[in-house]
């Protein structure tokens, strides 16, 4: 692992280099031989006796040793040619960056602007612009081919077992196929059941898909605040998050230099970037929600569309008639965006401008193919408030808005709670599918209990695994700092790894055809005492090695046939291996001693056959004794003499 930056600049240093015993490889789709779809290959030890394991990779070129990273130049703009090739877009000058875009920060506190400037694109006319419009028109885009190839990692090896894996899982109505084709991707997008968040101005993007019939995805939140962090830290957090498996990243910056921070992140991000535009709009009016206007908000949307933001959280479901429903809650309105709009509605005693101008928002977002992430501004902030009328009233409105956005050609996913105890989670998934026409669900956890500040990555990981199993398409991570402070680099990693576990557990439970490949490979390595393979097949090899080395630090311990838990004498796997090895070395004489001449095993009967024969004898004996559960002891003794 290396920390690289351009030696001629003080701009962000980011983590590069491959993960332990891994290498970047590329898959070429048959439908588009010009595409290179990245994946990570975990290289197993020579004695493994099995092939290396390919896994889904979110890390972009940062883990490719053949690529020189220069954050000042940004990543290659590969998608630009795809977008222009399709047509229906125009290049234009774009809006001028204004002082308020960065919070009117003074020169002494202004962050260095990203130097490379690219003119933005926007859609023109009625030609398809969004992935949804292309899908409905029967057109398979390069993005669709790309994500189909990514989703199929491991499925080719598992084709023979795919049906069995699907049958073994419980998908709760999801239609996970044995193999993902570009046509299947197109159909899912056309039906609104999946989205490819991919702004036409985010040319650096490696496309991915969000939907319940695909791998469960996770999102990591980053962003500065008025009191802490910088551009350098946030770019590094983004790269760090995707290194460990974040499929998307949301920039939730609320402090200075919001525009500049976002530009640096976007130009260096291979994953979709989401934002909550109301945060920046609020900064433009000195943090006073009452001063917000539709015109100011719309200008902020244009600004972020031109930069390349892939999805917007918009709290258009927080309506004036619903606010009073939160009055009796234990924790009221906990969403920042929701509370901002609630205050605006009450101050002006008007319906939310996000709701009244929703069709205009759709028209604007369509021009750039920015996806909606319809925000749950009235989500419960405590388990006491879970599944109340305020939460579900907003969800019903989000269903109404979903239909409007779809009619306008926009891609949509729906945000969900929050704080929900385990027994109330499934109704959230079921109601979302019903109200929102199976649009992808994207939830924050949910946290299943409120008693563990400092451990809410665990309280939420439990709920995330459950709702992912029930059909949630993307899980928003929670870090140990939830409710306590702004997460640092270590917290980001902990949150991402926790949610990778939850997402993978959900894929297993749904019966994803290739999900168990990695589990089985690691289990075999564990049984064979291939310690290095165990470490490297895990989600976090570095932590696994560190924990092992705390008690067994010598290199010789990494080939030992025991661990510190049981020691050499009591290791169950070692004992099992010894028994197997002993059985394999037995000669004919020893086997004859174990299975005397005339015994059923010696005659060739299988152990199962011997057991079944014995059970039959005992059944007959039960009948002979009169068929009674309890009998006299003397009678049993006499019966045994006969046998």
From Swiss-Prot:
GO terms for cellular component: cytosol. It is an enzyme of class 4 (lyase). Substrate binds at residues 221, 250, 279, 315, 335-337, 376-379, 415, 442. [4Fe-4S] cluster binds at residues 563, 566, 571. GO terms for biological process: thiamine biosynthetic process; thiamine diphosphate biosynthetic process. Zn(2+) binds at residues 419, 483. Its cofactor is [4Fe-4S] cluster. Its EC number is 4.1.99.17. InterPro entries: ThiC (IPR037509), ThiC-associated_dom (IPR025747), ThiC/Bza_core_dom (IPR038521), ThiC/BzaA/B (IPR002817). Pathway: Cofactor biosynthesis; thiamine diphosphate biosynthesis. Binds 1 [4Fe-4S] cluster per subunit. The cluster is coordinated with 3 cysteines and an exchangeable S-adenosyl-L-methionine. It catalyses: 5-amino-1-(5-phospho-beta-D-ribosyl)imidazole + S-adenosyl-L-methionine = 4-amino-2-methyl-5-(phosphooxymethyl)pyrimidine + CO + 5'-deoxyadenosine + formate + L-methionine + 3 H(+). Keywords: 4Fe-4S, Iron, Iron-sulfur, Lyase, Metal-binding, S-adenosyl-L-methionine, Thiamine biosynthesis, Zinc. It comes from the Bacteria. One of its GO terms (molecular function) is zinc ion binding. Belongs to the ThiC family. Homodimer. Catalyzes the synthesis of the hydroxymethylpyrimidine phosphate (HMP-P) moiety of thiamine from aminoimidazole ribotide (AIR) in a radical S-adenosyl-L-methionine (SAM)-dependent reaction. HAMAP family: ThiC. This is Phosphomethylpyrimidine synthase. The lineage of its organism: Bacteria, Pseudomonadati, Pseudomonadota, Alphaproteobacteria, Hyphomicrobiales.
């Amino acid at each position: 692992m290396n920390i690289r930056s351009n030696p001629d600049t003080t701009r962000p240093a980011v983590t590069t280099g491959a993960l332990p015993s891994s290498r970047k490889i590329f898959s070429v789709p048959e439908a588009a031989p010009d595409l290179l779809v990245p994946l990570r290959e975990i290289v197993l030890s020579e004695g493994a006796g099995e092939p290396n394991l390919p896994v889904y990779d979110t890390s972009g070129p940062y883990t490719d040793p053949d690529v020189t990273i220069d954050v000042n130049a940004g990543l290659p703009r590969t998608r630009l040619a795809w977008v222009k090739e399709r047509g229906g877009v125009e290049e234009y000058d774009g809006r001028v960056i204004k002082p308020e875009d960065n919070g009117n920060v003074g020169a002494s506190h202004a962050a260095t602007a990203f130097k490379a400037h690219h003119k933005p694109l926007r859609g023109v006319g009625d030609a398809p612009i969004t992935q949804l419009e292309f899908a409905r028109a029967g057109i398979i885009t390069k993005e669709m081919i790309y994500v189909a190839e990514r989703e199929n990692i491991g499925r080719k090896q598992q084709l023979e077992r795919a049906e069995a894996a699907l049958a073994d899982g419980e998908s709760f109505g999801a239609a996970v196929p044995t193999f993902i084709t570009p046509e299947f991707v197109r159909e899912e997008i056309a039906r609104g059941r999946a989205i490819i968040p991919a702004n036409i101005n985010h040319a650096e993007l490696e496309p991915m898909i969000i939907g319940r019939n695909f791998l469960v995805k996770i999102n990591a939140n980053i962003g500065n605040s008025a009191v802490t962090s910088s551009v350098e830290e946030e770019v590094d957090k983004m790269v760090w998050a995707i290194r460990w498996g974040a499929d998307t990243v949301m920039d939730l910056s609320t402090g200075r230099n919001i525009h500049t921070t976002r530009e640096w992140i976007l130009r260096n991000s291979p994953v979709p970037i989401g934002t909550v535009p109301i945060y920046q709009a609020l900064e433009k009016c000195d943090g006073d929600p009452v001063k917000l206007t539709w015109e100011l908000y719309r200008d902020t949307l244009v600004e972020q569309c031109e930069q390349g933001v892939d999805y917007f959280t918009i709290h258009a479901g927080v309506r004036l008639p619903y606010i009073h429903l939160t009055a009796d809650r234990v924790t009221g309105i906990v969403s920042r965006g929701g509370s901002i709009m609630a205050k605006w509605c009450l101050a002006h005693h008007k319906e939310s401008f996000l709701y009244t101008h929703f069709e205009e928002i759709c028209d604007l977002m369509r021009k750039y193919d920015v996806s909606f992430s319809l925000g749950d501004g009235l989500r419960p902030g405590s388990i006491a408030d879970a599944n109340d009328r305020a939460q579900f009233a907003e969800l019903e409105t989000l269903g109404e808005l979903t239909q409007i956005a779809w009619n306008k050609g926009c891609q949509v996913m729906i945000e969900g709670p929050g704080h929900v105890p385990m027994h109330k989670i499934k109704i959230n998934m079921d109601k979302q599918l019903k109200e929102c026409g199976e649009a992808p669900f994207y939830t924050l956890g949910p946290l299943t209990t409120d008693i563990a500040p400092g451990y809410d990555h665990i309280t939420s990981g439990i709920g995330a695994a459950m709702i992912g199993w029930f059909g949630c398409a993307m899980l928003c991570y929670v870090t140990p700092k939830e409710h306590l402070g702004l997460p640092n680099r270590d917290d980001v990693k902990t949150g991402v790894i926790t949610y990778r576990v939850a997402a993978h557990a959900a894929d297993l439970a749904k019966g994803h055809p290739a999900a168990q490949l990695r589990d089985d490979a690691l289990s075999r390595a564990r049984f064979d005492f291939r310690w290095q393979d165990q470490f490297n097949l895990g989600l976090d090899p570095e932590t696994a090695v560190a924990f092992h080395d705390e008690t067994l630090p010598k290199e010789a311990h990494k080939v030992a046939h025991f661990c510190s838990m049981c020691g050499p004498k009591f290791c169950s796997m070692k004992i099992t291996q010894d028994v197997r090895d002993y059985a394999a070395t037995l000669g004919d004489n020893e086997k004859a001693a174990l299975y005397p001449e005339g015994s059923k095993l010696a005659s060739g009967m299988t152990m199962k056959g011997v057991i079944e024969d014995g059970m039959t004898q005992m059944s007959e004996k039960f009948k002979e004794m009169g068929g009674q559960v309890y009998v006299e002891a003397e009678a049993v003794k006499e019966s045994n003499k006969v046998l």
